């Protein structure tokens, strides 16, 4: 019998990705502080937040397998967060155009049966096109990507902002690396094809 599988996320994009695996799961939204710690590298931030999300939900769901995930984008050593509004999104896109941004998509699978966890940071390099101010503004008015790191919803129209993507996992850029996740699930003998 499969243990319960829980996605610790409020992200509709992560939910849609997990649905691709056709596994039964539920969603529980973790309430954690997502502020980067002083001196923390972007990959450390993403890994810490993914683990905190999984552990927070696992504490209330004994015996479950809990998936935590977080994504941090970086350029010039600085974290590129969720813009929140049009003006900040436009500023982000101006800064990133013609440049390569690193997206750290961290994943943590917490096994509530054993208290063990597996973590991985899947890095994606996304090179942005050198688009005009008018094109960037039009994109923002059409897509409203104010809730995603880097203002680029690659699962939608945001893919047109990108010139090149390099990643070991094509789902990592959207925020839930499914290749890494299925490897972790196999490691705990969770049946993927049952």
From Swiss-Prot:
<dbReference type="InterPro" id="IPR003697">
    <property type="entry name" value="Maf-like"/>
</dbReference>
<keyword id="KW-0546">Nucleotide metabolism</keyword>
<comment type="similarity">
    <text>Belongs to the Maf family. YceF subfamily.</text>
</comment>
<comment type="function">
    <text>Nucleoside triphosphate pyrophosphatase that hydrolyzes 7-methyl-GTP (m(7)GTP). May have a dual role in cell division arrest and in preventing the incorporation of modified nucleotides into cellular nucleic acids.</text>
</comment>
<dbReference type="Pfam" id="PF02545">
    <property type="entry name" value="Maf"/>
</dbReference>
<feature type="active site" description="Proton acceptor">
    <location>
        <position position="70"/>
    </location>
</feature>
<keyword id="KW-0963">Cytoplasm</keyword>
<dbReference type="GO" id="GO:0009117">
    <property type="term" value="P:nucleotide metabolic process"/>
</dbReference>
<dbReference type="InterPro" id="IPR029001">
    <property type="entry name" value="ITPase-like_fam"/>
</dbReference>
<feature type="site" description="Important for substrate specificity">
    <location>
        <position position="13"/>
    </location>
</feature>
<dbReference type="GO" id="GO:0047429">
    <property type="term" value="F:nucleoside triphosphate diphosphatase activity"/>
</dbReference>
<dbReference type="GO" id="GO:0005737">
    <property type="term" value="C:cytoplasm"/>
</dbReference>
<feature type="site" description="Important for substrate specificity">
    <location>
        <position position="155"/>
    </location>
</feature>
<keyword id="KW-0378">Hydrolase</keyword>
<feature type="site" description="Important for substrate specificity">
    <location>
        <position position="71"/>
    </location>
</feature>
<protein>
    <recommendedName>
        <fullName>7-methyl-GTP pyrophosphatase</fullName>
        <ecNumber>3.6.1.-</ecNumber>
    </recommendedName>
</protein>
């Amino acid at each position: 019998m499969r243990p319960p599988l829980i996605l610790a996320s409020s992200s509709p994009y992560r939910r849609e990705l997990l649905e691709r695996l056709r596994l039964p799961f539920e969603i529980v939204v973790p309430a954690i502080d997502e502020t980067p710690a002083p001196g923390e590298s972007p990959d450390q931030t993403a890994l810490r937040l993914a683990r905190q999300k999984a552990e927070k939900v696992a504490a209330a769901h004994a015996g479950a397998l809990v998936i935590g995930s977080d994504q941090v984008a970086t350029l010039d050593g600085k974290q590129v967060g969720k813009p929140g509004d049009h003006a900040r999104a436009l500023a982000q896109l101006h800064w990133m155009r013609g440049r390569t941004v690193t997206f750290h998509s961290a994943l943590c699978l917490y096994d509530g049966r054993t208290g063990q966890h597996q973590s991985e940071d899947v890095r994606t390099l996304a090179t942005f096109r050198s688009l005009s101010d008018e094109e960037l503004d039009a994109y923002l008015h059409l897509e409203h990507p104010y809730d995603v790191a880097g203002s680029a919803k690659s699962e939608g129209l945001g893919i047109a902002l990108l010139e090149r993507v390099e990643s070991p996992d094509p789902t990592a850029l959207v925020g839930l690396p499914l290749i890494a996740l299925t490897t972790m699930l196999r490691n705990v003998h969770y049946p993927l094809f049952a």
